[in-house]
């Protein structure tokens, strides 16, 4: 048997590549790179030769020696790139492999090569400065967060052009004489005989529509006399202090004569459009008058039977038509009759409300229709309860007690039903009553508005004269009774 070799570094393996291997064109590397990496596994065992198997069994496993003149070996833990992956680390009992075992169980996750990798790229030489612009940057910036050049420039304010020539009728300006002359050559005259207006063709069309179209008022201001007359008319209507005082005096004189009414101004006023009607229904605090009337009626019911005989409140308004108030006022024969109760049906539709308001609207004045005292079923039932709870005056009490028990049972059933209905209404947030639409003026009424005003003023003057002169002698009788 051969003597074992001393425990020294063996000679470096021959790095000259064999012909035909991929490492032919590999450039020479530094020696420290090889020492920083783990050595490759030993080559596979060939078929045993006679006499060699016994010598291998006797020789221990020795590490190869570094080449002469090479640097001392580095620890593998110093260079993190040279460390094997976690799945390639040897188990704790792997140290016995260095003490004489023949086969290693070490398997690397990536193959190790002394030269180039199989794909032709050198290992551990990747460049980290790629000139590619990343796609996750916004388009308004570079990779270095720089704004583009066109955004850095501030927008300059444009200077207003300076015009030296003007056309007053067309309201246009021109920079030189040539453009002004070409524009003046395009002027045309108004096609009307008495009109001397001349301007551009489009402006002449607007002028004809506003001044000479059928139905338009013709204003002639050609002569200085017409201009002076037009100015005087404008000055009369201008609201100076003298004109205001003059108007006040005229109004006082008309009031003394009895001409109180004025011509109704028709058009898109408050209360005429559909949107204002919907706003009144939606906002109960500002415009909803049905609820205020209902609250007043509830207070009247709580007072007792004497409140039922009292007159309904008449809204006091300064601008109410006097003739309309006379028409709506009750006559003496109506006062003698008993007041009838008006009960609203269970299902009140908007069509029914509009029909009721149209029947109640008699006057053609601009005053609002007078509200009729409407009582709900709950209020009528409450009144019935008050009437039944009062002590009876007739001697036949047995008959009344039986009728009272029947009526009380009916009243309790109706009250339970009304409670359910009120709960449903509270949940649905629906108003119990719909406000009727205001009377929209007809075309004939709008055309005859001045004549209607004049006739009513004449009637009011007659009424005023009768009262002032005591035509029927009513004041004399009252004076005589006072003296007696």
Curated annotation (Swiss-Prot):
Expressed in the brain; in neurons and not in glial cells. GO terms for cellular component: fibrillar center; nuclear matrix; nucleolus; nucleus; perichromatin fibrils; pre-snoRNP complex; presynaptic active zone; synapse. GO terms for biological process: box C/D snoRNP assembly; positive regulation of transcription by RNA polymerase II. Keywords: Metal-binding, Nucleus, Phosphoprotein, RNA-binding, Zinc, Zinc-finger. It comes from the Eukaryota. Residues 1-28, 43-77, 269-294, 386-415 are annotated as: Disordered. The modification Phosphoserine is found at residues 329, 331, 333, 394. InterPro entries: NUFIP1-like, NUFIP1_cons_dom, Znf_C2H2_type. Residues 395-408 have a biased composition (Polar residues). Its main location: nucleus. The keyword Nucleus applies. Residues 283-294 have a biased composition (Basic residues). The keyword Phosphoprotein applies. One of its GO terms (molecular function) is zinc ion binding. It is found in: Nucleus. A motif (Bipartite nuclear localization signal) lies at residues 234-250. A zinc finger (C2H2-type) spans 165-187. Interacts with FMR1. Interacts with ZNHIT3. Interacts with NOP2, NOP56 and RUVBL1. Binds RNA. This is FMR1-interacting protein NUFIP1. It comes from Mus musculus. The lineage of its organism: Eukaryota, Metazoa, Chordata, Craniata, Vertebrata. The gene is Nufip1.
């Amino acid at each position: 048997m051969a003597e074992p070799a001393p425990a020294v570094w063996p000679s470096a393996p021959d790095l000259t590549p064999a012909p035909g291997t991929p490492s032919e064109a590999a450039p020479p590397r530094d020696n420290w790179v090889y020492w920083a990496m783990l050595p490759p596994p030993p080559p596979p065992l060939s078929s045993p030769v006679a006499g060699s198997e016994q010598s291998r069994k006797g020789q221990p496993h020795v590490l190869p020696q570094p080449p002469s003149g090479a640097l001392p070996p580095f620890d593998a833990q110093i260079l993190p790139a040279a460390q094997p992956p976690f799945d390639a680390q040897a188990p704790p009992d792997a140290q016995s492999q260095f003490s004489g075992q023949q086969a290693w169980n070490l398997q690397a996750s990536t193959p190790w090569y002394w030269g180039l990798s199989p794909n032709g790229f050198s290992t551990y030489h990747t460049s980290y400065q790629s000139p590619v612009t990343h796609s996750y940057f916004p388009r308004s910036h570079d990779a270095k967060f720089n704004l583009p050049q066109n955004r850095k420039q501030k927008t300059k304010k444009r200077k207003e052009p300076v015009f030296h020539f003007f056309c007053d009728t067309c309201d246009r300006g021109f920079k030189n004489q040539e453009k002004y002359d070409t524009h003046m050559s395009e002027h045309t005259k108004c096609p009307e005989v008495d009109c001397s207006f001349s301007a551009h063709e489009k402006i002449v069309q607007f002028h004809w529509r506003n001044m000479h179209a059928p139905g338009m008022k013709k204003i002639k201001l050609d002569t200085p006399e017409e201009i002076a007359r037009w100015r005087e008319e404008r000055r009369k209507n201008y609201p100076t202090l003298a004109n205001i005082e003059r108007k006040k005096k005229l109004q006082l004189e008309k009031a003394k004569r009895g001409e109180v009414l004025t011509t109704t101004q028709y058009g898109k006023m408050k209360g005429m459009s559909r949107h204002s009607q919907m706003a009144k229904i939606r906002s109960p605090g500002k415009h909803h008058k049905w609820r205020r009337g209902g609250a007043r009626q509830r207070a009247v019911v709580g007072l007792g039977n004497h409140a039922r005989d009292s007159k309904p409140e008449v809204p006091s308004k300064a601008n109410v038509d006097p003739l309309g108030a006379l028409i709506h006022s009750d006559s003496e024969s109506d006062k003698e009759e008993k007041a009838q109760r008006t009960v609203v049906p269970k299902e009140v539709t908007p069509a029914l409300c509009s029909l009721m308001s149209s029947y109640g609207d008699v006057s053609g004045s601009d005053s609002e229709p007078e509200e009729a005292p409407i009582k709900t079923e709950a209020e009528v039932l409450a009144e019935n309860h008050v009437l039944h709870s009062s002590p009876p005056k007739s001697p036949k009490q047995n008959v009344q007690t039986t009728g009272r028990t029947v009526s009380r049972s009916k009243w309790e059933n109706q009250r339970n039903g009304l409670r359910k209905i009120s709960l449903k209404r509270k949940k649905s947030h629906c108003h119990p009553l719909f406000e009727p639409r205001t009377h929209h003026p007809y075309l004939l009424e709008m055309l005859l508005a001045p004549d209607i005003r004049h006739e009513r003023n004449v009637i009011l003057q007659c009424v005023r004269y009768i009262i002032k002169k005591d035509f029927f002698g009513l004041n004399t009788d009252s004076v005589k009774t006072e003296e007696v």
